[in-house]
Amino acid sequence: MATEEIKYQPKDYKSDQYVRWCPGCGDHAVLNCLHKAMAEVGVAPHNMAVISGIGCSSRLPYYMNTYGFHTIHGRGAAIATGVKTARPDLSVWLITGDGDCLAIGGNHFIHAVRRNIDLNIVLFNNKIYGLTKGQYSPTSDRGFVSKSSPYGTVEDPFIPAELALGARGNFFARAIDVDLKNTTEILAASARHKGASVTEVLVNCVIFNNGIHKQITDKEFRADRTIFLRHGEKMIYGANNDKGIVLDGLKLKSVTIGQDGYTLDDVLVHDAHCKDNTLHLMLAMMGGDMPVALGIIRDVEAPTYDEAVHEQLKEVQEKICLLYTSDAADDLIGV
């Protein structure tokens, strides 16, 4: 008798816990997107584990009707690595913030990415330490004034994309908290990707860093300051879809289609599956006079650490078993 496939709804992933984030915090939106993405992918709640470190975003496991572990500061990636290696059948998610992930947890993060462990890493980036009440973080811009930098920071920030791709990451995406549709789409793609996926979500902290991303998230000028990349599609953006990205020598350039001799044919087509990450890194680093790249920037398949470990264990166990068969024992002693 055939069993009917269960159709999960977003509510199936919601726990009964009161959500304790501040009203207006961007984390609320990301949580809702994750509920919707999981329902879309169809991962059973009992086949999902959500791991986190310490920080505002790291409270998320409490709000998921799944297995979860609220661990210690910066160590979420290490715990998630162990969970996935021990239970490769689970969909394992790492929820982390810019401080938790890139400061005390930086080493665990880059090695989880380098090893290509099949983890879904969601990096909430609000460029501030919110839980400890407003200190600058590893992603805060140079000159940023905070409680721990009253005269402005004198250091340059980490750029999560540069770090993830530099660690040989095979999946990197960027989303914004106010774009629920596309953020849900990205998280669903992250869940389907086999290997380490890193999704940076630009979130707003209404209390300690309000409006930090408004130059690209406000609807008034979002279309002209961001470009949403889709594999196989032209890199076009703008309120009138009249701007595009072209290659000018060894650099990317934003042009207006129909001006200065540029046509639609000159505009680059996004190839998220290209194994060479050179162009992906260039796209991920855009900003300033160039639009900030959103969407799935890189999505490449590669062998995963967790599968390789289990394949190696199986191979070694089979060899050990052979030692205890009579034929193998005879061969071993030369009979």
For each feature predicted by the language model, list its residue ranges.
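Active-site diphosphate/adenylate-binding microenvironment
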Residues: 7, 11-72
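Thiamine diphosphate
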Residues: 54-130, 182-184
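Short coil/turn connectors at secondary-structure junctions
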Residues: 17, 44-48, 86-92, 114-120, ...
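Electrostatically charged, flexible surface regions
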Residues: 194, 203-310, 314-315
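Conserved thiamine diphosphate
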Residues: 9, 89, 137-192
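Conserved small/polar residues in nucleotide/adenosyl-binding loops
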Residues: 324-329
